[in-house]
């Protein structure tokens, strides 16, 4: 692979495969052009150095992004488009492939869905008896700091798709994923409701900014 380092991202991808691109090169591939002062590779590197990672860059809000020199509305739209495309890819992959859910897959999917939400959203993943995904739904939407959850509605949706188990999740827009006492109480209520219909609650994940808490990992479920 001599000379690979001299290739532009598109040529490198076409010759050696997309997996050979660094984060900087992959970002440059999407941005396509740099600024008057920097070529696209230098600009992509500067962006990643400023934000620290692809995740932090794509999770940044509009004010944070357009404050960067050379990053106008066009590049802001490109970056948000990349993030949304990734979110929708995760969403469709989980259902279309009827994926067997693993803890890491669950976490990555839920983070892609909930991290950037500005209100609390309560999601449920419905699974069959082999832990394959039947569907996932955003069942409840709330405010910046609260979402009202109705356990019977969760059970009703589970029965509709003949689910044997569910995974619960909601986000904390404040950034901290630490569960509140109210979070623990509603989880207990959902577990009791589901148990009555012989539906297992496998986990409840609280998603924050770049962090999460799993009730199962803490031994609360």
Curated annotation (Swiss-Prot):
Record domain MPN: where: 99-221
Organism: Klebsiella pneumoniae subsp. pneumoniae (strain ATCC 700721 / MGH 78578)
Disulfide cross-links: none
Family the entry assigns: Belongs to the UPF0758 family. YicR subfamily.
Positions with a binding annotation for Zn(2+): 170, 172, 183
NCBIfam families attached to this UniProt entry: PRK00024.1, radc
JAMM motif, short sequence motif: residues: 170-183
PROSITE patterns xref list: MPN, UPF0758
Alphabetical list of InterPro entries matching this protein: MPN (IPR037518), RadC_JAB (IPR025657), RuvA_2-like (IPR010994), UPF0758 (IPR001405), UPF0758_CS (IPR020891), UPF0758_N (IPR046778), UPF0758_YicR (IPR022820)
Name by which UniProt lists this protein: UPF0758 protein KPN78578_39390
Lineage: Bacteria, Pseudomonadati, Pseudomonadota, Gammaproteobacteria, Enterobacterales
One annotated GO molecular function: metal ion binding
Domain of life assignment: Bacteria
Swiss-Prot/TrEMBL keywords: Hydrolase, Metal-binding, Metalloprotease, Protease, Zinc
GO biological process, one term: proteolysis
């Amino acid at each position: 692979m001599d000379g690979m380092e001299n290739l532009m991202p598109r040529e490198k991808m076409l010759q050696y495969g997309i997996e050979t691109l660094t984060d900087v090169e992959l970002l440059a591939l999407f941005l396509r052009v740099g600024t008057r002062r920097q070529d696209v590779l230098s600009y992509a590197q500067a962006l990643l150095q400023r934000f620290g990672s692809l995740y932090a860059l794509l999770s940044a809000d509009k004010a944070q992004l357009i404050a960067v020199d050379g990053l106008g509305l066009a590049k802001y739209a490109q970056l948000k488009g990349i993030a949304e495309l990734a979110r929708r890819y995760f969403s469709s992959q989980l259902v279309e492939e009827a994926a067997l859910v693993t803890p890491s897959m669950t976490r990555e999917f839920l983070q892609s869905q909930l991290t950037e939400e500005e209100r609390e959203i309560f999601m449920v993943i419905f699974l069959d008896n082999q832990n394959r995904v039947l569907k996932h739904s955003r069942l409840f939407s709330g405010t910046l700091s609260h979402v009202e959850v109705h356990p019977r509605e969760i059970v009703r949706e589970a029965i509709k798709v003949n689910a044997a188990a569910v995974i619960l999740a909601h986000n904390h827009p404040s950034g901290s994923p630490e569960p509140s006492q109210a979070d623990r109480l509603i989880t207990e209520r959902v577990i009791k409701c589901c148990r009555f219909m012989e539906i297992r609650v496998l986990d409840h994940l609280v998603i924050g900014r770049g962090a999460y808490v799993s009730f199962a990992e803490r031994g609360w479920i």
